[in-house]
C-alpha cells in the first residue's frame, strides 16, 4: 500500500508566529499603509485631529474617492458608520456627483479595528437642483422627503437609513449652499 503525505506549506514556527499576529477587522495589521490608503487620505486629514491611531479627514471627493474605493479590501467596502450608507456607495456618489465631499475618520494600527469610516456627506445645492429641478424648501427642511431626495442623489435604495442630523449650511465664506448629513 502506498501512502501520500502532504506537508504543510509553512513550518510550525511560521504558523505559530502567524497566530501571534491577530487578523484585524478588515485585514492584517498595517493594511491601510500596505494598500496605500494612508498616503491617499493624508492630504485630507484635518488639522488638530491627527491623534495617532485616530484621525479625521474632510473634503474627500472625485478621483480620490474613486481611488479609495478601488483600494479598500472587499470586506471593508461594506463598512457602515453608525447605520450610514455603505462606504462603497458613498465613495461612488462622491466619484459621480460634482462637488459632493465626504468626511470621516481613519483608525490606524495597532488597533485591531483598523479602517476608514465615512460619517458625513456634503452635497452642493447645485447637485440637488440638477436632480430635482428646484432649490431647497427651507421652511420645511429637513423633512423625510428631503432625506429621500438626498438618498436619490447619492444613488441609495429606499432602505437606506436617514442621517442623525441633516441641515443646510454655507461654508468657506462663499454663497454656495450645501446639504450636510451626519450619521453619529
Can you name each region flagged by the protein language model?
Residues 24, 42, 140, 171-176:
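Intrinsically disordered, low-complexity regions enriched in Ser/Pro/Gly/Gln/His and often acidic
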Amino acid at each position: 500500500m502506498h501512502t501520500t503525505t502532504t506537508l504543510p506549506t509553512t513550518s510550525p514556527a511560521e504558523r505559530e508566529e502567524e497566530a501571534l499576529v491577530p487578523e484585524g477587522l478588515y485585514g492584517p495589521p498595517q493594511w491601510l499603509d500596505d494598500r496605500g490608503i494612508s498616503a491617499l487620505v493624508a492630504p485630507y486629514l484635518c488639522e488638530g485631529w491627527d491623534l495617532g491611531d485616530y484621525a479625521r479627514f474632510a473634503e474627500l471627493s472625485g478621483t480620490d474617492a474613486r481611488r479609495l474605493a478601488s483600494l479598500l479590501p472587499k470586506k471593508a467596502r461594506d463598512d457602515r458608520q453608525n447605520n450610514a450608507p455603505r462606504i462603497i456607495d458613498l465613495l461612488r456618489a462622491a466619484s459621480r456627483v460634482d462637488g459632493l465631499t465626504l468626511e470621516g475618520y481613519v483608525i490606524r494600527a495597532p488597533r485591531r479595528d483598523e479602517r476608514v469610516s465615512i460619517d458625513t456627506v456634503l452635497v452642493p445645492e447645485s447637485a440637488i437642483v440638477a436632480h430635482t429641478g428646484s432649490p431647497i424648501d427651507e421652511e420645511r427642511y429637513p423633512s423625510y422627503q428631503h432625506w429621500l431626495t438626498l438618498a436619490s442623489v447619492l444613488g441609495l435604495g429606499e432602505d437606506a437609513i436617514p442621517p442623525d442630523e441633516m441641515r443646510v449650511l454655507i461654508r468657506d465664506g462663499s454663497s454656495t449652499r450645501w446639504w450636510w448629513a451626519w450619521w453619529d
